[in-house]
Amino acid sequence: MGISIVIFEICLLWGQILSTASQSRSSTPDWWNHGGTINDVIYDTQETPEVTTTQVPDSTSIGTDSGLAVRLVNGGDRCRGRVEILYQGSWGTMCDDGTDSGLAVRLVNGGDRCRGRVEILYQGSWGTMCDDSWDINDANVVCRQLGCGWALSAPGSAQFGQGLGPIVLDDVACRGHEAYLWSCSHRGWLSHNCGHQEDAGVICSDSQTSSPTPGWWNPGGTNNDVIYDTQETTETSQTSSPTPDWWNHGGTINDVIYDTQETTEGTDSGLAVRLVNGGDRCRGRVEILYQGSWGTVCDDSWDINDANVVCRQLGCGWALSAPGSAQFGQGSGSIVLDDVACRGHEAYLWSCSHRGWLSHNCGHQEDAGVICSYSQTSSPTPDSQTSSPTPGWWNPGGTNNDVSYGPEQTTDATDSGLAVRLVNGGDRCQGRVEILYQGSWGTVCDDSWDTKDANVVCRQLVCGWALSAPGSAHFGQGSGSIVLDDVACTGHEAYLWSCSHRGWLSHNCGHHEDAGVICSDAQTQSTTWPDMWPTTTPETTTDWWTTKYSSSVPTTQFPTIADWWTTPSPEYTCGGLLTLPYGQFSSPYYPGSYPNNARCLWKIFVSSMNRVTVVFTDVQLEGGCNYDYILVFDGPENNSSLIARVCDGFNGSFTSTQNFMSVVFITDGSVTRRGFQADYYSTPISTSTTSPTTFPIVTDWWTTPSPEYTCGGLLTLPYGQFSSPYYPGSYPNNARCLWKIFVPSMNRVTVVFTDVQLEGGCNYDYILGFDGPEYNSSLIARVCDGSNGSFTSTQNFMSVVFITDGSVTRRGFQADYYSTPIRTSTTPPTTFPIITGNDSSLVLRLVNGTNRCEGRVEILYRGSWVPCADDSWDINDANVVCRQLGCGSALSAPGNAWFGQGSGLIVLDDVSCSGYESHLWNCRHPGWLVHNCRHVEDAGVICSLPDPTPSPGPVWTSPPFVNYTCGGFLTGLSGQFSSPYYPGSYPNNARCLWNIEVPNNYRVTVVFRDVQLEGGCNYDYIEIFDGPHHSSPLIARVCDGAMGSFTSTSNFMSVRFTTDHSVTRRGFRADYYSDFDNNTTNLLCLSNHMRASVSRSYLQSMGYSSRDLVIPGWNVSYQCQPQITQREVIFTIPYTGCGTTKQADNETINYSNFLKAAVSNGIIKRRKDLHIHVSCKMLQNTWVNTMYITNNTVEIQEVQYGNFDVNISFYTSSSFLYPVTSSPYYVDLDQNLYLQAEVLHSDTSLALFVDTCVASPHPNDFSSLTYDLIRSGCIRDETYQSYSSPSPRITRFKFSSFHFLNRFPSVYLQCKLVVCRANDVSSRCYRGCVVRSKRDVGSYQEKVDVVLGPIQLQSPSKEKRSLDLAVADVEKPASSQEVYPTAAIFGGVFLALVVAVAAFTLGRKTRTARGQPPSTKM
């Protein structure tokens, strides 16, 4: 009877585990041998229950401890047969309950195990699947089952070739959450109506990232004492993964160890940590491997800080709780640690303060446990650079010899036997480049090695983009072959060996020229620098101690200080550009001593509408704040306020006011210590004006944990689970927990609440779900007691907030989340209801419009759809509606039943929103069903754009792409831009140009966060130009998937987005920021002169005094002599004097001069002449300032961009004698308005031309609803008239005042002016009307944008009037006797390209509640 019980337990447990795990792992067991001998073989995967061993102690824990093993016998090969388990020293069989005996899945013919044709092992044979109904949900199940991440695509039509044998399944319909593919709905086994030409395939996210087969395959030899450690590669035995390379036909394998473990991590020899008895590897009793035995930890002083260290060490996220009292059962053996006291930032548990090894005063009833955030989710493989795993082959009873093969760096390959890795850099994303070729690792020569080559390596290793491409064996000299030389990549290749090169093994260099790479992801990891350098003494050079520093590159390099008095040492790197939403950085060599005379700059640049918070977790510097210190700036280093100066012993945090922060670490020439370590993260900039009603205990995982509990966190896996604190125990009072769920792009987030037991009533304890960031997204739902259900976001980001009051706690809640791909529909529904309210019975929609984002406003109230009245209805109310429906911002708020009259009750009237409410019914109103109007006053809304990302209601299709706008002129210090309709599909045949201009002597950096375009760089692409696009060199062409950053050499950059006529995708999103350039030289192009300045210290470094620098031939003229200050030599150079030359060519005007410093007397010279060339280049409306220095060896180039000054004013009459000086300027409707514009510049040979003037009811939108006065020089309005002017530099014109109909309150006028060379009849100013196609891809004229106004029209009465409007109509007076409204006009002087605005404003009923002036309702 006892034996029956034991067998029954094994059947249940192993039947369950093997059905979930053994079919998701694949490796050749190490004990398999054809004709050979196997000794001391250990097969350890730990995350699955598969453990095969011949020398293990007994174990009481079924399925995890090393006393268990599994094998397949009597099947003919190692991957089939009867399942037998080694239990208590004897092999036994396993019953088949729940295991789906004989079922397995694999992907073949795809190049790696995570992509290919889907095949299922059924009844002993591999068969294929038909692609009928095959989609991304089905593919997700396959990817998850194989441990390959999530699905990128689900190709059909035998994309990976036609299979053989039976077609096993057809019409598969998965929901996406099934554990096995055969658990999905399908037609039936072997039932189908298709052929192999329809075989289904899958491409998973982990494709091309797994380690390839190493080249030391031994088909007939002997391998002794081999350790093969892949750490991250775990496969199912049924997949077509490669056979391990130690496979031996006819040979002998001794002491073979195959290690894919994920649950033990360590650094000290013999130390490791694991969690047992918790159901998965991320929860359970804490055990430490010490002196060859596993022991427990006592729970004295055990808290969340200690648990956080364990979770991070195991790659299990962060700690949810730290249970004690042997919650996961009592352990056996020694109690290894007691009184553990971690700060929470230690790398290893044993690094924390503790009582001492094996010293304790407790028993196993106090064994400590941990529950990590990744528990019950698909736990990711811990990054190799963040922890050092203790090999899972540790065998206290066996023998292991010392030969180890452990490719700890990530390798990536496609061709058989080819792979790339980075070594000797401290983590997998930086180091010496090595390629696996013909079975051996070899290096790459640095001839022609540059950032383009490095970018290919970084992208291939999934390490971001390249920060630098160091050569000269920066990461130490390699050994073995030099595999490649003269590598010349374009930067877009998929693999390094796809680039042009000299040929395999062909080179003319030595290992002292080995190439290296530093990728962007390397800077975001903990920079713990190991002793990686060779111990041999390099050849001594004469200038090895010189500090290498350049502000133009993102990293700073210094020589290592060890033994500096005898031998040179390899260099290290510090500083960098950090662009991820969170990460970590530290001083060089941390936790070792930092070097002397260091200056490291970290630029932390996160997404717009976010702030940066830096938390210093460990600061140990030289005492005194004048020697070694850290500076924190609120933006770029050279032009931002100093937030803090951090000195020795300080721990704390600082937050920026924007999305950019600079951190500078400076040390002096003596005394070095441990250094510092810091974490950073981004948080949304709150737009809320009121503080939360409850105190935020913990809102993010990076926040310092509460002494009692933690809650909330950042969830980035494609699926997972979270719950209230202490669930299923009672949650705490006054809690506020925020979970940020961020899944892969082109996916939505769905949260399913499986258990919700809160205090009754929705005003006390509740859960809020937001469609994006908490503070600037619409509320999806308010979940209260008993409200089980699911909610889906419209994007790949959802925020969930749990709030409790000060009394009554209950069980809490538990929720699952998962991601699903965004799909589109071909037929839009006629109405678009979306449940968004606090009350599930309230629904908002827009009807009778052309899409879901415009129409009559209707609310579902008590089961019926009812409209809203237009009394007090304005743009603020409309903004709330648009944001609530995910439709952008409001363009207008038409009333008077513009979209037709509704029927039934009128639910709301006199709605008065501030514009920031989350729901329309949260705005002020008299009450439900309280009104004094009829359906002729039904309110409507027109939103900016239909959202191409459907909401969780009915799906819809974007309207035809006919009236979109893209591109623009960006002048802020930082900002963001994206492709049209992003994240929806961009349109075909798009030509979008963004011109980014920042202040003089700044540089522009653009960071591409997301690039998803049509594959192939000849169809849809982004081009980055180092200045205006039509006259500047191309920096880069960005194609599908090629994210990265690019920096201009001037203060101007152009970005052009081009698409062809077919295939559209998600598009791109980019941020830009500006950074101050070096101050050696400086050039400004002003309206009357150039101002060139040169640093005196720079002149001195070149061997010249400040008086040696002159304008050649003009040094005797007083006006051409420089002003010499304490720091600079400043020249004021007129455009028409001091030797300035003027050259006109191809629609440009160049003003050039140069400065010179030279030896003026003597027979010989030992100093090089110094020439500084300066020029101001005008491109129609843009000044291009260039400054460069030539002195035979040193060239410094400065490029700046500026603008014309333009004065534009209203005049009283056509004589243009008297400008309007009153403000406001009152005019009648249809009154003539006279304007004069003049370009301000000392050069008199310029001309000004009015190219386009467009009117709009909106100040910032001149595309949706416009009226043209003149366009491209072609007059469109009958009242427009130009006048002769006394000078080509002046232009004069007039038009009659007007206003738009349909209650648009304002009219804004935008004019584009062109600057040309006077008397040049070929220029734009003399060509008049030019008809140009909408998407002309040829060169075009840049213009000066000027917006005039405002002009306010006041109605003579406050009575309601109904106005009919055709969108393009402009109202004219009915008769000359009619009383016209008047308008107030403001004019002024504006910089060209700076918008100056003219508005004709129509008012309506007074709304004193908002503090606005009275206006008239029409």
Curated annotation (Swiss-Prot):
GO cellular component, one term: transport vesicle membrane
Main location per the UniProt record: secreted
Glycosylation sites: 638-639, 651, 776, 788, 838, 848, 963, 1078-1079, 1115, 1146, 1150, 1191, 1207
Keyword vocabulary terms for this entry: Cytoplasmic vesicle, Developmental protein, Differentiation, Disulfide bond, Glycoprotein, Membrane, Phosphoprotein, Protein transport, Repeat, Secreted, Signal, Transmembrane, Transmembrane helix, Transport
Residues modified as Phosphothreonine: T1406
Protein location: Secreted; Cytoplasmic vesicle, Secretory vesicle membrane
Membrane topology: Single-pass membrane protein
Molecular function terms, GO-annotated: zymogen binding
Disulphide-bridged cysteine pairs: C130-C194, C143-C204, C174-C184, C298-C362, C311-C372, C342-C352, C445-C509, C458-C519, C489-C499, C574-C600, C625-C647, C711-C737, C762-C784, C882-C943, C913-C923, C966-C992, C1017-C1039, C1253-C1311
PROSITE patterns, sorted: CUB (PS01180), SRCR_1 (PS00420), SRCR_2 (PS50287), ZP_1 (PS00682), ZP_2 (PS51034)
CDD domains the record matches: CUB
Tissue specificity: Expressed in von Ebner glands (VEG) (at protein level), olfactory epithelium and the lateral nasal gland. Expressed in transit-amplifying ductular (oval) cells. Up-regulated at day 3 after hepatectomy. Expressed in newly formed bile ducts and in structures resembling intestinal epithelium.
Pfam family, one: ZP-N
Residues annotated as domain ZP: 1084-1332
Phosphoserine PTM positions: S1415
All copies of domain CUB, residue ranges: 574-683, 711-820, 966-1075
Region (Disordered): 375-410
Residues annotated as transmembrane: 1383-1403
Domain of life: Eukaryota
Low complexity: compositionally biased ranges: 375-391
Similarity section: Belongs to the DMBT1 family.
Function of the molecule: May play roles in mucosal defense system, cellular immune defense and epithelial differentiation. May play a role in liver regeneration. May be an important factor in fate decision and differentiation of transit-amplifying ductular (oval) cells within the hepatic lineage. May function as a binding protein in saliva for the regulation of taste sensation. May play a role as an opsonin receptor for SFTPD and SPAR in macrophages tissues throughout the body, including epithelial cells lining the gastrointestinal tract.
Note on domains (UniProt): The SRCR domains mediate binding to bacteria.
Protein name stated in the entry: Scavenger receptor cysteine-rich domain-containing protein DMBT1
Naturally occurring in which organism (per UniProt): Rattus norvegicus
Gene name of the encoded protein: Dmbt1
